[in-house]
From Swiss-Prot:
GO terms for biological process: proteolysis. NCBIfam families: class_E_sortase, sortase_fam. It is found in: Cell membrane. This is Sortase SrtE2. The chain crosses the membrane at residues 30-50. It comes from the Bacteria. The active site is at 220. It catalyses: The enzyme catalyzes a cell wall sorting reaction in which a surface protein with a sorting signal containing a LPXTG motif is cleaved between the Thr and Gly residue. The resulting threonine carboxyl end of the protein is covalently attached to a pentaglycine cross-bridge of peptidoglycan. It comes from Streptomyces coelicolor (strain ATCC BAA-471 / A3(2) / M145). Induction: Transcribed independently of the operon's upstream, overlapping gene (SCO3851); transcribed with srtE1 over the first 72 hours of growth. Part of the strE1-srtE2 operon. Residues 1-11 have a biased composition (Basic and acidic residues).
């Protein structure tokens, strides 16, 4: 048998070394894969945040503007046609019943529609409650609570600056024929999302003990969460008839 040479020993040793993976190399590869996964997850989360807090606002603003334009066009046609005031029921249209103006929130005019479902609020509007407590529309002239909700973040974020409202600040609701001017009298920065008593005809925790003409604004809190509810209450101080130029009340000038 021929003797094994030194060269053969070296080749065999080299071949055996290539067959084994060093623990350090495996760990490095695992860390690399994990890093790539984390970067991908971060990008996905970033895109989701952009979608939730920016793109949904764009879509909602477009929808709200379109619906608001329809409401104002309908009002203008009614006046030109000489139909005059059609009564409370006629205001409750699919497109919206009127516009909310809250100078402290700097949101301009906010279209108000019937209902507080996500389907309604996601269009960048405020909605009045029909469940679990039914809101009393100011156009009914009945005592009660005109309770409203809107998103705090995303989908138009109409009540994003609700925390800027202070006692004494005006809240104005505009219909085809009337301006309803309310004055903020109480704020509840945080309460359970299940606390429906704040929506009652005589809203609990607002300090009121007798029936009156109230308005309630509700939204999620803290910002970017839906854990609790932020509540603002106002009381009607006067009404003004809408003139031909739709001159706003002094609180909005």
């Amino acid at each position: 048998m021929a003797a094994t040479t030194d060269t053969e020993h070296q080749e065999q040793a080299g071949t055996g070394g290539r067959g084994r993976r060093r623990p350090g190399r495996i760990a490095a590869q695992a860390v690399s894969v994990l890093g790539e996964l984390l970067i991908t997850a971060g990008l996905v989360m970033g895109l989701f945040v952009v979608y939730s807090l920016w793109w949904t606002n764009v879509v909602a603003d477009r929808a709200a503007d379109k619906q608001a334009e329809k409401v104002r066009d309908d009002w203008a046609q009614d006046r030109v046609g000489g139909s005059g005031q059609d009564g409370p029921g006629a205001l409750d249209t699919k497109a919206g019943i009127g516009f909310l103006h809250v100078p402290a929130m700097s949101e301009g005019d906010i279209l108000v529609e019937k209902g507080t479902s996500m389907k309604i609020l996601n269009d960048g509007v405020a909605g009045y409650y029909t469940d679990p407590v039914k809101a009393t529309l100011p156009t009914s002239d009945e005592k009660g609570n005109f309770s409203l909700a809107a998103h705090r973040d995303g989908h138009g974020a109409r009540f994003h600056n609700i925390d800027k409202i202070e006692k004494g600040d005006p809240i104005v609701f505009e219909t085809k024929d009337t301006w309803y001017v309310y004055k903020t009298y109480a704020v509840l920065p945080e309460t359970s999302k299940y606390n429906v008593e704040v929506l009652g005809g005589i809203p609990k925790e607002s300090g009121k003990k007798k029936a009156g003409h109230y308005i309630t604004l509700t939204t999620c809190t803290p910002v970017y969460t839906s854990r609790y509810r932020y509540v603002v209450w106002g009381e009607l101080v006067r009404t003004e008839k809408v003139d031909g130029d739709r001159t706003p009340p002094k609180e909005l000038r």
